[in-house]
Amino acid sequence: MLHPRARTMLLLSLPAVAIGIASSLILIVVMKIASVLQNLLWQRLPGTLGIAQDSPLWIIGVLTLTGIAVGLVIRFSQGHAGPDPACEPLIGAPVPPSALPGLIVALILGLAGGVSLGPEHPIMTVNIALAVAIGARLLPRVNRMEWTILASAGTIGALFGTPVAAALIFSQTLNGSSEVPLWDRLFAPLMAAAAGALTTGLFFHPHFSLPIAHYGQMEMTDILSGAIVAAIAIAAGMVAVWCLPRLHAMMHQMKNPVLVLGIGGFILGILGVIGGPVSLFKGLDEMQQMVANQAFSTSDYFLLAVIKLAALVVAAASGFRGGRIFPAVFVGVALGLMLHEHVPAVPAAITVSCAILGIVLVVTRDGWLSLFMAAVVVPNTTLLPLLCIVMLPAWLLLAGKPMMMVNRSKQQPPHDNV
């Protein structure tokens, strides 16, 4: 017979698996629709019209129209496409289900139109809202926080294709003073994360790892080099942290989301023209292209890092629906490659992984997630001790510093009466 503790853990196992599968399927459907629309906007349509897809007019035009379209969705959809991601953490409170159709449409338009944001925040919002709404009907005795945790774990597993990230993140958030053992509390979230990851793996495999030269043996000088790289990435990220709330306040003085996002899309188009097509979209596929292109120089990598970081800030400040983690990883890769080109004696594995660690730490303020992203993009077990050591001075640098979010008290009210 099972111990009462085991029976308690099994109570939520079936709902956890169902939520993990559903979280993954929602992500897959949204990404597939966005991919089809992206192909139409950036491949078939310019080909039919006889226009180069990297034409400055096409890039500016598509991103401007994308901003206007997203603005119309936010202005007129019920619930105004959910909360502004610039004012929200990755895992937030559940939103009313009535806001989800507008949020999904706004996300798809942004992903397809080339906006420099990822899908993680809106998908997380959608999955949490659905899990809480449906779970409260089916199992009213389970509280909202349990459904929120299961949905966020399933989404994290689906996004990254592995339950490891969820295990790392929730090991700190669920580790309270309760007498219930940590792994008892992790059981159901890990079931959801595993179900989400396995479901995603049936359809496609998230490809984060880059073909970076293997790193052999750690030396003492490598720790210093890695700490310096992480500090440079943190400094770049903190510039974005300073700019985001100020640009957000300035943009939203115009009140009308169609105007705000139209102007934001136009600015993104100009940045896209300067950075080229590789600086568009969420950044995961584009960082593969960046690494594969042997023609890029130090100045090219620097330009891409600056443009992508600026595009991330503009997109978030304008109110586009999307997440900041994936484009931040692109910025980290570009910074790392730039520093390696500038100082070839420092291995690319160190510069890239430590730059990712630093910039993702700025964006998320989550040490485990930052370590995870650095480790999966540059998969090398020799790097793990170095990354753990480099994390320490990086965490000290960011202690007490503002986060990459707009203060909720300064958030503009919904556009109900605009």
UniProtKB/Swiss-Prot annotation:
Transmembrane segments: 10-30, 54-74, 99-119, 120-140, 149-169, 186-206, 223-243, 258-278, 300-320, 322-342, 343-363, 371-391
CDD domains attached to this UniProt entry: Voltage_gated_ClC
Superkingdom of origin: Bacteria
Pfam families, per the entry: Voltage_CLC
Primary location recorded for the protein, binned into one broad class: membrane
Keyword Mitochondrion: no
InterPro entries: Chloride_channel_YfeO, Cl-channel_core, ClC, ClC-type_chloride_channel
A GO CC term attached to the entry: plasma membrane
Protein location: Cell membrane
Molecular function terms, GO-annotated: chloride transmembrane transporter activity; monoatomic ion channel activity
Keywords (A to Z) from UniProt: Cell membrane, Ion channel, Ion transport, Membrane, Transmembrane, Transmembrane helix, Transport
Membrane topology classification: Multi-pass membrane protein
Entry similarity comment: Belongs to the chloride channel (TC 2.A.49) family.
NCBIfam families: PRK03655.1
Entry protein name: Putative ion-transport protein YfeO
Source organism: Escherichia coli O9:H4 (strain HS)
